[in-house]
Regions:
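Conserved ATP-binding N-box helix of the HATPase_c
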Residues: 21-42, 128-156, 200-214
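Conserved DHp (HisKA) dimerization/phosphotransfer helix of two-component histidine kinases, i.e.
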Residues: 37, 41-44, 57-112
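Glycine-rich/acidic phosphate-handling loop/turn and adjacent ATP-lid/helix
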Residues: 163-208, 229-231, 238-242
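Glycine-rich ATP-binding loops of the HATPase_c
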Residues: 212-227
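Histidine phosphotransfer helical core of two-component systems
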Residues: 2-3, 8-12, 16-23, 31-71, ...
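Short beta-to-alpha transition helix within the HATPase_c
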Residues: 90-107, 135-141, 163-170
Length: 245
């Protein structure tokens, strides 16, 4: 039976909101980090101003530094805001996009005892940034949320050429397969609680909703998930829905 449109929209918006809520602590952490240099510079300026004979040259240098740091903070905040309102037409190389997301979520995964291994660094093919920031990131979170204990997260990528179906003239396009695997490791600290939650857990229904919206094929199990992305923006086949095993 086909799911009503309003129910699909509700599931999609619920998944987006849950992912955003899970992202907020990381955004706040990055904002605090960006503000730290300004705080230090302000403290130095205050100390110099309290001197009986302030050194105007040093104060001028501090003021120049303060202005430069303020611009950097503004740029950082503007960039962080794109995580909440991403541009749908923005593309990014797979290696850069994956590195960005793993860096953003590194603290949460570390706090929960997970180690991240990124093996996508040679994959320069471009994909829509919204796919990585929604489907890929949700897959990472869902996989760790459903894990019974901490482990090693391994991200790999493969680029293949596939036939595009549905055009008058059949052609080929690159398909990027991103695989996220979760493997146990004897040296992992099993005492670290996996369920350090700031909102609710993400599950595979959330991932499916986001994947369908972005036209990404997914195959998921309890030990990993593979995303099939067309960097041409066209989909070769219907999304393959695989039961979580």
């Amino acid at each position: 039976m086909t799911q009503p449109t309003h129910e699909k929209n509700h599931a999609l918006e619920a998944a987006r909101y849950a992912l955003m809520r899970r992202l907020v602590p990381s955004l706040l952490h990055n904002m605090a980090g960006a503000l730290q240099p300004i705080s230090m510079t302000a403290a130095i300026m205050e100390k110099r101003l309290q001197s009986p004979t302030p050194d105007l040259i040093l104060l001028g240098k501090s003021s120049t530094s303060f202005k430069a740091q303020s611009r950097d903070v503004a740029d950082t905040f503007a960039h962080l805001a794109t995580w909440l309102a991403p541009q749908s037409d923005q593309s990014i190389a797979v290696n850069a996009g994956v590195e960005e997301i793993l860096g953003m979520m590194a603290r949460e995964f570390s706090d929960r005892g997970f180690e991240i291994v990124n093996e996508t660094k040679i994959t320069t093919a471009e994909v829509p940034q919204t796919i990585l920031r929604s489907v890929f990131m949700a897959s990472l979170v869902a996989l760790t949320d459903t894990a019974e204990s901490p482990g090693r997260i391994i991200v790999t990528s493969i680029v293949t050429s596939v036939d595009i179906i549905g055009d008058a003239d059949s052609s080929e396009s690159d398909e990027i397969s991103l695989t996220i695997s979760l493997k146990g490791h004897p040296e992992m600290d099993k005492s670290i609680p996996v369920d350090v939650q700031r909102y609710r857990k993400l599950d595979w229904d959330d991932v499916q909703s986001l994947a369908k919206e972005e036209k990404v094929g997914i195959e998921c199990t309890t030990h990993g998930v593979t995303l099939h992305i067309k960097n041409s923006g066209r989909v070769a086949n219907e999304i393959k829905n695989v039961e979580v095993r």
